[in-house]
Amino acid sequence: MKWGLVVLAAVFEVVWVIGLKHADSALTWSGTAIGIIFSFYLLMKATHSLPVGTVYAVFTGLGTAGTVLSEIVLFHEPVGWPKLLLIGVLLIGVIGLKLVTQDETEEKGGEA
C-alpha cells in the first residue's frame, strides 16, 4: 500500500510533466496543476512511513521512465535501443531500491 502511493504519485508526475510541455489552454494548465498537487500529496503521504531518500529516488526514477515512455508512445518521440536500455537500467535501480528498503513499521516490528 505504501509503495503503491509512490507509484501513483509517479503516475501523476508523468501527467504534470507532460502537461508542462503540451498545455496550451486554461483547462490543460489546470490539469497540470491538479497533477502537481496530487503527485506531491501522495509523495508526502508515502514519506510518513518510508525513508524519504528512497521514496524520492523511486518517485523520480519512475517518473522519468514513465515520462520518456509516454513521450515515445503518445507523441512519437524518436526511440533507439540505447534509450530503451538506459530506461531498463533505471528501472532495475528503482526495483532494487524498493527491494532493499524496509518501511518504518517493519523496522519497529509493529503495525502503523
Curated annotation (Swiss-Prot):
<feature type="transmembrane region" description="Helical">
    <location>
        <begin position="26"/>
        <end position="46"/>
    </location>
</feature>
<dbReference type="GO" id="GO:0055085">
    <property type="term" value="P:transmembrane transport"/>
</dbReference>
<feature type="transmembrane region" description="Helical">
    <location>
        <begin position="55"/>
        <end position="75"/>
    </location>
</feature>
<comment type="function">
    <text>Probably involved in guanidinium transport. In vitro, confers resistance to a broad range of toxic compounds such as cationic dyes, neutral and anionic antimicrobials.</text>
</comment>
<comment type="subunit">
    <text>The efflux pump is composed of GdnC and GdnD.</text>
</comment>
<dbReference type="GO" id="GO:0005886">
    <property type="term" value="C:plasma membrane"/>
</dbReference>
<keyword id="KW-0813">Transport</keyword>
<dbReference type="InterPro" id="IPR000390">
    <property type="entry name" value="Small_drug/metabolite_transptr"/>
</dbReference>
<keyword id="KW-0472">Membrane</keyword>
<keyword id="KW-0812">Transmembrane</keyword>
<keyword id="KW-0406">Ion transport</keyword>
<keyword id="KW-1133">Transmembrane helix</keyword>
<feature type="transmembrane region" description="Helical">
    <location>
        <begin position="79"/>
        <end position="99"/>
    </location>
</feature>
<keyword id="KW-1003">Cell membrane</keyword>
<protein>
    <recommendedName>
        <fullName>Probable guanidinium efflux system subunit GdnC</fullName>
    </recommendedName>
</protein>
<dbReference type="Pfam" id="PF00893">
    <property type="entry name" value="Multi_Drug_Res"/>
</dbReference>
<dbReference type="InterPro" id="IPR045324">
    <property type="entry name" value="Small_multidrug_res"/>
</dbReference>
<dbReference type="GO" id="GO:0006811">
    <property type="term" value="P:monoatomic ion transport"/>
</dbReference>
<feature type="transmembrane region" description="Helical">
    <location>
        <begin position="3"/>
        <end position="23"/>
    </location>
</feature>
<dbReference type="GO" id="GO:0022857">
    <property type="term" value="F:transmembrane transporter activity"/>
</dbReference>
<comment type="similarity">
    <text>Belongs to the drug/metabolite transporter (DMT) superfamily. Small multidrug resistance (SMR) (TC 2.A.7.1) family. YkkC/YkkD subfamily.</text>
</comment>
